Amino acid sequence: MYCLPNHLFFFTFDRKWSSNFPKNGGVYLVFDKGVLIYVGESANVKERMKDFKRTVNHTFRRKLGKHLFKGATITNGKFNDEIESYLNQYYIDNISVSAIEIIFGRTEIESNLIEKYKKSGILNSESKRNATQFI
C-alpha cells in the first residue's frame, strides 16, 4: 500500500498524540515514509497507541529495531540506550499511523491485510491466529 490514507497521523512524543485515535476496537496501519510496514489491531486503538513508543510494550517497535539494527538484542524488554534513542528519532522523522474503528471482524481484516501485503516487506510475522481468510 503506497497511498496515504485520509487520516494519517505523524508520530510525536506528545502525550496527546494517542487522542487522535478511536477508543474502540480497530485496525491500524503503520507507514515508514508513506510505505506500509506494519498492520495491527486492538480492542482499544487509543490505548494501544500509548504503548506504541515503548519497546517493551509494542511488537512493531521491537521488529523495527531489529530490522534497522541487524543483530540488535533486547535486554529487559528494550534495546540499549543508543538504539532506543535512535528509534525515537526514527519514529519522529519517518513513522505515521492511520487507524479505522472496526467493532466486529478486526482480526480477520488485520489477517487479510497482512496476507495481502506480506510480500511487500511488511514487518508482521505470520499470524498466530486461525482467523478465516476472506480474499
Question: What are these regions, as identified by a protein language model?
Answer:
Residues 1, 88, 115:
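Short, exposed beta-strand/loop patches in secreted or surface proteins that constitute
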Residues 1-54, 80-82, 100, 127-135:
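GIY-YIG nuclease catalytic motif and its immediate N-terminal context
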Residues 45-103:
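Conserved short loop/helix modules at catalytic or binding sites
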Residues 104-135:
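C-terminal charged interaction modules
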